[in-house]
């Protein structure tokens, strides 16, 4: 049986920070970052206390052992995604991964007149790199229209594609609305038009089984810290033939075979081509443990747990009479809402006073607020494997009381 209360015992944050503002801590900002398990923390601490070495840069036992540990990590991630180890590139996070695609592929292959398709719901990490590439190359950024409830539909993608479209980039699950997009169907449509697909998996990979072979996406980006792993580590998956054609986003030690005074350089094959400099080795080891932890819980159980929590949370918030919910029907464990008549940041500040950590603002998705939501800011509560119904009850109680409290305070 999936028991989030028992799962909390594996996370020292719940032991070491049991309260906030004098009230029991309710952590509902998991779409931003997640707590780390004992196993993840131990892996990071062990690197700094027992295993410190560089990788691929020494002829001694510690370095050899680190080489093997990184190889094991790469194989673990490859098995996790159902791809080849050579298609797994370690990066600083989803932002680093998306920029690697934008600059490594887009800057090299896109030209004036070409088109990139994104949506208005994208996180800034999947918008601004493409804006930059458009500025540098003269290509154009266009948008797939969202449906009335904020989804990407196959029909709308089909309409948005043109003979000029070269690449489509979108999130499998949006970080604001939380809709699970039909990735496989969308990818097939794009490929039928000869268009590449770059998938932002920051909000999907931590929560559901991801099979890149089945989805057939060309690129996938995700972060470790959103899936119980350390900060500063992420992954870029890319089909090997595409990675082989790309230039590195960052150059330096460890990503080249040779270079000469005439400025000529021969880069190593992927993935090393994209891993210049000393990597976040502690992060790589910690991410491996996070993947193993999630696999041990089972993604079917995680999906079902979050589905039930989402349904429960929607019901409880609507019962308060104070909540305006913008994504009640979305699949992910994300609820974006406002307390009626209260500015989002004021609401989040009040929730903080009740020991509840939620996110407020535009959630790095400024285009969505300007177009679809048509509101300056929202509050976002997001769930994960250790979130309980008690956490939802605390949120609902605060929303119920907060509307009246804040009305009295500001009026």
Report each predicted region and the residues it spans.
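Pyridoxal 5′-phosphate
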Residues: 1-411
